[in-house]
Amino acid sequence: MVSDVSEPSDTTPEVVVQQQPQPKTLTHLISGASAGLISAISLQPFDLLKTRLQQQQRSNIKYRTTISKELKKLTHIRDLWRGALPSTLRTSVGAGLYFTILSSARNGISDYKRSSDSVSDTSILPKLSPFENLATGFIVRAVVGIITMPITIVKTRYESNIYNYNSMYEGFENIYLDGNQKGQGSLKNFFKGSFATLARDCPYAGMYVLFYELFKNDILTKVVPPIDETENGPITRSTIINTSAAILAASVSTTITAPFDAIKTRLQLSSIVASKKMTLWSATKDLMREDGGVKNLFRGLSLRFGRKGLSSGISWCIYEELIKSNFAQVIITKSDKKLV
């Protein structure tokens, strides 16, 4: 009877959970920001081309732009990284905040439930119900989206060929004074297209977390066979599962929210100097009136599809691997020692 009691106690989930303490908040911030920075720099060309495809199109068919036409307009390969500075600032800060707040929210819910089955075998992040994943992703994205909206406007205009900003300061100044001849600006200009952006990003983030956890914990763990990690170097089973889940989740979520991305870009590129104040409804009507009709709501989808898939695969994989490793914690410890 003694052996029967002692044997299962060595394999209970509680012991595994105790061996994997939850990372500190600053660890999530550093890991998320690092993942966002790498993703933004490597995938900036996708963002630039997508923005230019979604610019206002002329009715004459010969003026309608394509990816090949936009590539031919570039004089140097570095032009593909125009707007990289505001993009990296937005993505690194946004990703750091998003992962940190999301982790805190998910840990809070997990602690409240006090479930013994709250940890995945491929991740040390908490395991929640589908609705909880959807809700936390949705709400956290709304908070971070509002915080990073001003830099998002600068990024979008930087990437277009409508506004030829030479510096971020010029971009902020131009947006602040947009359409006002008397030199009196408005902070409201930095939140232009906020509703369309949140209508795209919040459902996307909610669905992304939902599908990511679904693919990671319920599908891919049954599909991806165990591998000998000693022979595959840095490539582990969890890396394959996390990356694949991120790409699949991003692909599904991107397709569903594509129309709001096109509307958001049109709103953020509009200027009250050129026309009357554009609204969500007027931007949608303008897009559908142009050659292509409803298809215009999905312009740039292939680029966003590729970028979001790769971005999610890169950022979530790097984030999860950094969280599981002691990389961020080592940085924090070293900085603390220097301060002492």
Curated annotation (Swiss-Prot):
The protein's name in its UniProt record: Mitochondrial glycine transporter
Annotated SUPFAM superfamilies: Mitochondrial carrier
Topology with respect to the bilayer: Multi-pass membrane protein
Pfam families: Mito_carr
Species of origin: Debaryomyces hansenii (strain ATCC 36239 / CBS 767 / BCRC 21394 / JCM 1990 / NBRC 0083 / IGC 2968)
Transmembrane segments: 29-54, 83-109, 134-159, 193-216, 241-267, 300-318
The UniProt record lists the keyword Nucleotide-binding: no
Protein family (similarity comment): Belongs to the mitochondrial carrier (TC 2.A.29) family. SLC25A38 subfamily.
GO cellular component: mitochondrial inner membrane
Compartmental location: Mitochondrion inner membrane
Entry superkingdom: Eukaryota
Function, as annotated: Mitochondrial glycine transporter that imports glycine into the mitochondrial matrix. Plays an important role in providing glycine for the first enzymatic step in heme biosynthesis, the condensation of glycine with succinyl-CoA to produce 5-aminolevulinate (ALA) in the mitochondrial matrix.
Source species taxonomy: Eukaryota, Fungi, Dikarya, Ascomycota, Saccharomycotina
PROSITE patterns given in the database record: SOLCAR (PS50920)
Gene3D superfamilies: Mitochondrial carrier domain
Keyword entries, A-Z: Membrane, Mitochondrion, Mitochondrion inner membrane, Repeat, Transmembrane, Transmembrane helix, Transport
Gene Ontology molecular function: any one: glycine transmembrane transporter activity
Chief location of this protein within or outside the cell: mitochondrion
Solcar repeat residue intervals: 23-108, 128-218, 237-325
Reaction catalysed by this enzyme: glycine(in) = glycine(out)
GO biological process assignments: glycine import into mitochondrion
